[in-house]
Amino acid sequence: VSIGMSDGTLYVTPMADDAIRVQYIPDGIELPELENLIHTEKQDERACIYKQIGSRVTVSAHGDGLRAVVNARTGKITFKDANGKVILKEDVRSVQAGKTGDFNSLSVSQSFKTAPDEFLFGTGQFQDGYLNIRGLTRRLTQVNTQISIPMIISNKGYGILWNNYGLTEFNPSDYMVVLEQGAGDGTSVTVNATGTAGNVRERRFFNDFSGEIEVKESGDYSILLDVGQSMARKHLLTIDGDTVINANNTWLPPTSSAITHLDKGTHKIFVS
């Protein structure tokens, strides 16, 4: 089912009795033909139930299955079960044209409203130690021991597959702090490393960085540490002397995340 919006077209496709695919294509955009690395099974076209009452459009595979209820004015979607109970409700969606190097690209964001008692699992294999990732910021990159899978499962009985091959931020940060490097050459260690070139001995250097962050109100905050390189050897982040992130091994991804409680006011950050 295609639904015309003010700046694009929304496609809602029942893939099975309990699965619905949603696509949005802005006007004037030609999408390249890319190999589908996630949805690889050939699927026959199937009939679906379509009903419109005023600005409300309901799409489902059949009357007793999962249904998507679309607000035809705003394009926002609410997913309901066969009994009409809300499973998931869309909050904000954004599609903006941009550049990736010399190529035209789209920057897409999608958010949903979740319950305070909900647990979310998924996004792949990470070293941050979190099983419930509700509210946790993660950058989904493939690097050595980190395996990113753009899918989450809820304890409420649903799942979301983000079928997008671009760099993805889960619960993206809305505030960035650039830290200043400390004086001195830093410490170094020599390690044995195994890679595609075989076993080698490497000398690795560590530097210290510091800065401050201003918190407007007390609460739990998600912190993402980005070392600015393709890989890292150490993740150490303290706030006001308290350790928030601490990982040290031969192969670390460039980012790591944690949720911590911060009181209102200024806090000192130290990273090594």
What are the roles of these predicted feature ranges?
Residues 265-267:
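Exposed beta-strand face motif in extracellular beta-rich ectodomains
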